[in-house]
Amino acid sequence: MRRHLPFLAALATAVSIGFDAEAGPLSDAAARAESQANTGDTAAAWETLRQAVSDFSQTLPFAIGKAVFVAAAPVGYAMYEPKQDSTFKAGEKLVSYVEPVGLTWKKAGDEGKVETRFTVDLEIMNPDGDVLASQKAFGDFTFTGYMRNQEIYATLTVDINSAPAGDYVLRYRFNDINSGESATVDQPFQIAAQ
């Protein structure tokens, strides 16, 4: 075993050098931001990281990052109170907090602004996948600003007061208008017997 130690040490060094060489733009930006922060330029460090994440997000496929039932409408991004379970009383509204990721941005009409837009289709199904109700473009969201904001969420509220007690699946299909891509998320839920 001792005769293999120099070889293993050389291999470990080669592997770590390989990883350093392949670090990529996010690692490079993090190093720049750390250097900026160490010299007291907090604003520049923050902007460096924000721009790097914004650029990286454009390489991601469109997807849903988080989808949860919430006890009340959120007050901001990641500022929500999750519902303790997915059982609802008859007549209780289903409120979902959903974070799309990998949105495509394009130039907006105003100088220097960018815009993203997505629609949300809705289906309510039984556990076997049979569609009981549906609506295209249930939600339509447009975000315009001076940067490709990553802290985007949708609050979706569904009123199911006529549904009988039982198990269901709420399916949202998010449609990124700028890329033509779609992402689907299912939220199983139950209507309690009265």
Model-predicted segments: where are they?
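Bacterial N-terminal signal peptides that target proteins for export
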Residues: M1-L8
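Bacterial N-terminal signal peptides
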Residues: L8-S16
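Sec/Tat signal peptide C-region and signal peptidase I cleavage site
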Residues: I17-A23
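Intrinsically disordered, low-complexity terminal regions enriched in Ser/Thr/Pro/Gly
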Residues: G24-Q194
